[in-house]
Regions:
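Exposed, low-structure sequence patches enriched in small/polar residues
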Residues: 1-345
Length: 345
């Protein structure tokens, strides 16, 4: 319950597994069907993919966060994982987005929409040849990131279904793999891309994940601001080089501490076509006035980091620099320290 907005938030899910499970629902291979219902705030442009958004460490932020809507979701998910590491996930998602003071739904004619519905139908195909897991009593952990991972996702939401005012039709694909550099460590590499084929509201477009916390979050940008970039086509990359002591091992006292170097380079290059630009498509909702939106004009957003891993066997500390779109940004959005718990085996 929120004491300031005076709204209840809740979530519930029910899953049936076609395979017998010994300890937990994510045991490989998964073959299940799940129905879920959720009502909560939607932190627009800040979707943490591998961390619970209610994590206490995410509550400390470098700037005030007001870009939120209320979102109600009713989902049906079917997941099938095969022994050859090919998986299919099909989903039907009835979603209602409710406007707030900071994220209103207003078109260029001044027409205000308090809320709108979309019914998303999506299919995700994933193939990771050679992928293996270490299964504990509560979770499964991938143990060989050398395996390449290919993911293809397509999402379609027809106009008019359950009152949906717009069509959404978009495709995304990604590739990730670990590359070994012999005695010089290894590189974890990921590249992603996507395109929106339809004329759709901005919340259904392709928005990079901004990370306002002081923690290191995968597949997000540590110094980007929420809704700073909104695109209907993009390509992004994320490279982390783990040097395995290639530099620090030459310093005798430091070598005994077994500290390890970590360097990262990530970026996002996107574009927004006229059909999804609310200034040129009058019936689309305008971007929020409170959002720091900036068109890309062919120049990618980029940031780099350098850090030390294996502090106390479990801590990584990075210093991050923003390379592009620095003009007009506060100091906290140009560079800063970030930390993460990182345990290796």
């Amino acid at each position: 319950y929120g004491t300031k907005d005076r709204k209840w938030k809740y979530g519930a899910e029910l899953e049936y597994s076609f395979n017998r499970k010994r300890d937990h629902q994510r045991e490989f291979p998964v073959h299940s069907i799940m129905v879920s219902e959720k009502y909560d705030v939607d932190q627009v442009g800040q979707h943490y993919l591998f961390t619970n958004p209610d994590n206490v460490f995410l509550s400390l932020k470098r700037m005030e966060n007001v870009l939120m809507t209320y979102r109600r979701q009713t989902r049906l998910d079917y997941t099938l994982e095969l022994a050859n590491n090919f998986s299919v996930k099909a989903s039907a998602n009835l979603e209602r987005q409710e406007a707030t003071t900071w994220v209103p739904f207003v078109n260029s004619s001044g027409v205000v929409t308090p809320h709108y519905n979309e019914t998303y139908l999506s299919v995700e195909l994933r193939y990771a040849p050679g992928e293996k897991f270490f299964q504990t009593k509560t979770q499964r952990i991938p143990v060989n990131l050398d395996a390449p991972v290919f993911v293809l996702t397509h999402t379609y939401a027809p106009k008019g279904l359950f009152g949906a005012p717009f069509t959404v039709n978009k495709t995304e694909a990604s590739f990730s793999k670990r590359f070994w550099l012999s005695a010089f460590g290894f590189v974890d590499f990921m590249v992603k891309g996507g395109h929106v084929w339809s004329r759709s509201p901005y919340l259904s477009l392709l928005i990079p994940n901004a990370n306002l916390s002081y923690t290191i979050q995968p597949e997000s940008f540590a110094l980007m601001n929420p809704l700073e970039f909104i695109n209907d086509s993009y390509v992004s990359w994320d490279m982390t080089y783990w040097a395995n002591g290639a530099i620090l091992n030459y310093i005798p006292l430091v070598k005994k501490l077994k500290l390890r170097e970590a360097f990262a380079f990530r970026g996002w290059l996107g574009a927004l076509s006229d059909k999804n630009n609310p200034l040129k498509s009058p019936d689309l909702y305008l971007f929020p006035v409170s959002a720091p939106y900036e068109p890309m004009h062919g120049k990618p957003y980029m940031e780099i980091s350098a850090g030390i891993d294996n502090f106390f066997k479990c801590l990584r500390v990075d210093y991050v620099w923003r390379l592009t779109y620095r003009e007009g940004q506060p100091a906290s959005s140009r560079s800063g320290l970030r930390i993460a718990l990182h345990v290796t085996f």
